Amino acid sequence: MGIKGLNAIISEHVPSAVRKSDIKTFFGRKVAIDASMSLYQFLIAVRQQDGGQLTNEAGETTSHLMGMFYRTLRMIDNGIKPCYVFDGKPPVLKSHELSKRTARREETEKKLQEATDQAEKMKQERRLVKVSKEHNDEAKQLLELMGIPYITAPCEAESQCAELAKCGKVYAAASEDMDTLCYRTPYLLRHLTFSEAKKEPIHEIDTELVLKGLDLTLEQFVDLGIMLGCDYCDSIKGVGPVTALKLIKEYGSLEKIIEYIESDSSNSKWKIPNDWPYKDARELFLKPDVINGNEVELKWQPPNEKGLIDFLCGEKKFSEERVKSGIERLKKGLKSGVQGRLDGFFQVVPKTKEQLAKAAAKAKAAKKSGKVTKKRR
């Protein structure tokens, strides 16, 4: 689900923290991709002309494999070295959100049965899409054959992607979930795995510029995310994005915000959930269950050509001609990606406080003038 309204807050208050770029901009970059989110996108977006999912002759769904194969090839074509991170066991605190999703699925199934219009049926069918263990296992098998590294996180994929980026194993985390910023990834890439036909630029969000532009510490930013609404607990009823930002800036923490709300009867319009586990939610963001990034070794290997043809063509009935063409693109792209970037030959020096303060001032000036300034790489 991510965090409701966070993207809008950043766009309004720190527009210069978001850079919109063509995929070619990231030539030579290593990127950790939220695999589960990507597979969900593929199952929804990769469809036949009649709107149904792609299937082979046996009726098995292949949309996830088609999407994974060709979207990965597109990244490789553009010199990006992707690695994928799969979700592990969801935290106990997420069970309430999963229960909500189950209830929504039941409601959607009811609407699907009642739908008479074809467009409405397709709409409800897409809402029922769910990534299964089989989808994940087949995607891992495909990546193994392609020579693309992947890891299974102990818990949330986004937090593991952020960990790899923080440790310098990759340049950025790629996910559509804005809560990835709460794990303090240096950069978050959105829309990286979108279809080329969408013509959607990649949004690169600089976490440090976001924090400085909003004038918040990481802890305060996480508290803001919890107030806006995250996967781990309910939010304060009646508090929207504008009020949430105002409260966290004025009071500095959820503890003091709760104290303020409970101290004045005029604040009764805001409802704090009973037994609100916001501290546990905060802990999941600040101290996530991840594999230490320094202990992870990412290797991109030559593709297993025979294995790919046997799996995709023999078993899944993909076009052999197209798969062989894809294999050649894969081999060529992995070689060209080895060239790397010029800045890869130099040590990356963290931004100083003065540089961050200057960038924050620039962001505020851009907001006042109504102009969005692009940071240069």
From Swiss-Prot:
DNA binds at residues 47, 71, 156, 229, 231. Keywords: DNA damage, DNA repair, DNA replication, Endonuclease, Exonuclease, Hydrolase, Magnesium, Metal-binding, Mitochondrion, Nuclease, Nucleus, Phosphoprotein. It comes from Vanderwaltozyma polyspora (strain ATCC 22028 / DSM 70294 / BCRC 21397 / CBS 2163 / NBRC 10782 / NRRL Y-8283 / UCD 57-17) (Kluyveromyces polysporus). The keyword Nucleus applies. Belongs to the XPG/RAD2 endonuclease family. FEN1 subfamily. Residues 120-251 are annotated as: I-domain. This is Flap endonuclease 1. The lineage of its organism: Eukaryota, Fungi, Dikarya, Ascomycota, Saccharomycotina. InterPro entries: 5-3_exonuclease_C_sf, Flap_endonuc, HhH2, PIN-like_dom_sf, XPG-I_dom, XPG/Rad2, XPG_CS, XPG_DNA_repair_N. It is an enzyme of class 3 (hydrolase). PANTHER family: FLAP ENDONUCLEASE 1 (PTHR11081:SF9), FLAP ENDONUCLEASE FAMILY MEMBER (PTHR11081). Residues 99-119 are annotated as: Disordered. One of its GO terms (molecular function) is 5'-flap endonuclease activity. Its EC number is 3.1.-.-. One of its GO terms (biological process) is gene conversion at mating-type locus. Mg(2+) 2 binds at residues 177, 179, 231.
